[in-house]
């Protein structure tokens, strides 16, 4: 396990040994909804810099206690200090927006997000979801039963840039149908991660459509086509770190895997974007898990996955039970620029 301090010291040492500091001029940043110009060109230092960071992706099962099969009101405060050692943490079901006057507003659920962040010292954090109108959703006309935000969050010891939150174009499932995906603004989050002075990569956090019915399978394919198109438009030529709960069962045996449909969706997405699954890169033995990390090099920044490990033994309660219905995935990423 790699602490932020250790990663930071390695980066500082590598940069200090570099020869010169000629940096490509970075474009000025724009608002969360745009930022295309700034994100389309990777800033790269002419002096060789290198380092390592620990990336954790974790679905924290933060649905309201009243509708959850887990125990978020008890477990989320226990999760918080366990996030501290990691350099970059990407969360799912970490909800920080709920419908004003909705069902969740009168419950203890509204405190989960702040409790999740209560015992960590990461300096750089995503701000609260701006609400449906800010991401192009007319809640009354399009999703009248929607109650929650996208549940996506970033905690980082490295600087992050402007944040763009993008909901999936469509969803399936209400209170009494499918996997209830239309109750939240599921989608993906895009920002930049500054590895060192003048060295940045694009960072994506996502939560995919759940369920294994025909409607779910069709939407899962649509979702990853939408994400691939966004990456082509916003991250052309750039290095990328992408992680999250894909809800793609790529083990060919799971009942929600669509008899291999999920395998094909993930394979097609990786081919379209040039990303590599960290499980494949490290020859891991659990490639069927739905929590995934993928990466690619670009813009003068080389990335590699040095380890891929689910932290099942750490994120548990006093009885050894998992604190979420997902185990967090840690991937150690090595990088080199110049």
Region annotations inferred by a language model:
Residues 47-50, 83-84, 118, 144-149, ...:
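Extracellular/periplasmic catalytic domains that process cell-envelope and extracellular macromolecules
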Residues 39, 231-241, 248-338:
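Metal-dependent phosphoester-hydrolase catalytic domains
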Residues 14-16, 26-119, 130-139, 144-149, ...:
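N-terminal, active-site-proximal structural segment of metallo-dependent hydrolase catalytic domains
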Residues 53-60, 79-105, 155, 191-193, ...:
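Active-site beta-strand/loop signature of hydrolases that rely on acidic residues for catalysis
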Residues 63-68, 168-180, 207-218, 250:
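Surface-exposed cleft-lining segments at the edges of enzyme active sites
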Residues 56-63, 91-95, 125-134, 156-158, ...:
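Active-site-proximal beta-strand/loop segments in catalytic clefts of secreted hydrolases
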Residues 95-200, 208, 307:
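Structured beta-strand-rich core segments of catalytic domains in phosphoester-bond hydrolases
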Residues 1-18:
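N-terminal export and membrane-targeting signals
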